[in-house]
């Protein structure tokens, strides 16, 4: 059996939100392989995030963030179980980080992949199946390639699957799980809206030189 270091146990705990002894056992069962240890914990259903997922999270806050210059704004609702936690600095910092994350991710439209309507996945499949680079490939190979591309595209639309802007080594989902382990309550990102100044407005295009000349009174 591989030597299980405290550093490795902490890394697994940060990624999953599971307890220290559970993480140590998972690493022992998987010979120190952290990826397999995460799978082991999920199979056993003992990660703290999963344990708390069914608990009602009706408190929390609506966080706002306006990017420098005022061109991008975000509103996001982040829920927890108690008002006490909602008023704490750890939860407030989490909500602020999530709002900044949304501001930095123009492609993100949904909280998680499960929220994406099936018609969007179906449309992506239709597009991918018609690509020229798949012509002539066996159906089974084509299907695997298409499924991989669809999964990648759907993750691009999902907030929880994005690398966290403050720490690229973890995803937003892992950040939330880590916060659940720290705070000890269920935490949910319920909904968000990203605003871009002038988005959807058809702007009148003018000759730039003529505009400058007009401003100079020529």
Curated annotation (Swiss-Prot):
Subcellular location: Cytoplasm
Chief localization: cytoplasm
UniProt keyword Transferase present: no
GO CC annotation, single: cytoplasm
Molecular function via GO: translation elongation factor activity
Record's keyword annotation contains Lyase: no
InterPro entries: EF-Ts_dimer_sf (IPR036402), Transl_elong_EFTs/EF1B (IPR001816), Transl_elong_EFTs/EF1B_dimer (IPR014039), Transl_elong_Ts_CS (IPR018101), UBA-like_sf (IPR009060)
Renumbered residue ranges of the record's region Involved in Mg(2+) ion dislocation from EF-Tu: 82-85
Source organism, top-level taxon: Bacteria
Entry keywords, A to Z: Cytoplasm, Elongation factor, Protein biosynthesis
Family assignment from sequence similarity: Belongs to the EF-Ts family.
Role of this protein: Associates with the EF-Tu.GDP complex and induces the exchange of GDP to GTP. It remains bound to the aminoacyl-tRNA.EF-Tu.GTP complex up to the GTP hydrolysis stage on the ribosome.
UniProt-recorded name of the protein: Elongation factor Ts
Organism: Picosynechococcus sp. (strain ATCC 27264 / PCC 7002 / PR-6) (Agmenellum quadruplicatum)
Taxonomic path: Bacteria, Bacillati, Cyanobacteriota, Cyanophyceae, Oscillatoriophycideae
